[in-house]
């Protein structure tokens, strides 16, 4: 049976990965031409994209390090 820490770690890694993907997509959309239809669609959409852009900027490097450390830890546990 799998212990609770393993399940919580898997859930945490999944949430972090999804947040990194959404934030990365927001950075891509934000870097498009300002006259593009995505950024001119609505103020709420532009605000949401900006928030995810800042989240992406703040978690990109730490998130990558955490995901890599977890991967290395799982490799060491298999040995």
UniProtKB/Swiss-Prot annotation:
Which residue ranges does the entry give as Intravirion-facing topology? Answer: 1-8, 69-79
- Its primary localisation, in coarse terms, equals virion
List the subcellular locations: Virion membrane
Please tell me whether the keyword Transcription regulation is annotated for this protein.
no
In terms of superkingdom, the source organism counts as Viruses
Please indicate the ranges of residues that lie on the Virion surface side: 30-47
Give TM segment ranges. 9-29, 48-68
Topology class, membrane: Multi-pass membrane protein
Induction comment from the UniProt entry of this chain: Expressed in the intermediate phase of the viral replicative cycle.
Q: Which UniProt keywords apply?
A: Late protein, Membrane, Transmembrane, Transmembrane helix, Viral envelope protein, Virion
Entry GO terms, CC: membrane; viral envelope; virion membrane
The reply on keyword Mitochondrion is no
Extract the Pfam families matched here.
Answer: Pox_I5 (PF04713)
Q: Which protein family is it in? A: Belongs to the orthopoxvirus OPG081 family.
Q: What does this protein do?
A: Envelope protein.
The name of this protein is: Protein OPG081
Species in which this protein is naturally found: Vaccinia virus (strain Copenhagen) (VACV)
């Amino acid at each position: 049976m799998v212990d609770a820490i393993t399940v919580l770690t898997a859930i945490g890694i999944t949430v972090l990965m999804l947040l990194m993907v959404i934030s990365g997509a927001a950075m891509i959309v934000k870097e498009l031409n300002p006259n593009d239809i995505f950024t001119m669609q609505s103020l709420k959409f532009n605000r949401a994209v900006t928030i995810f852009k800042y989240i992406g900027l703040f978690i990109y490097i730490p998130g990558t390090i955490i995901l890599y450390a977890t991967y290395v830890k799982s490799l060491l546990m298999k040995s």
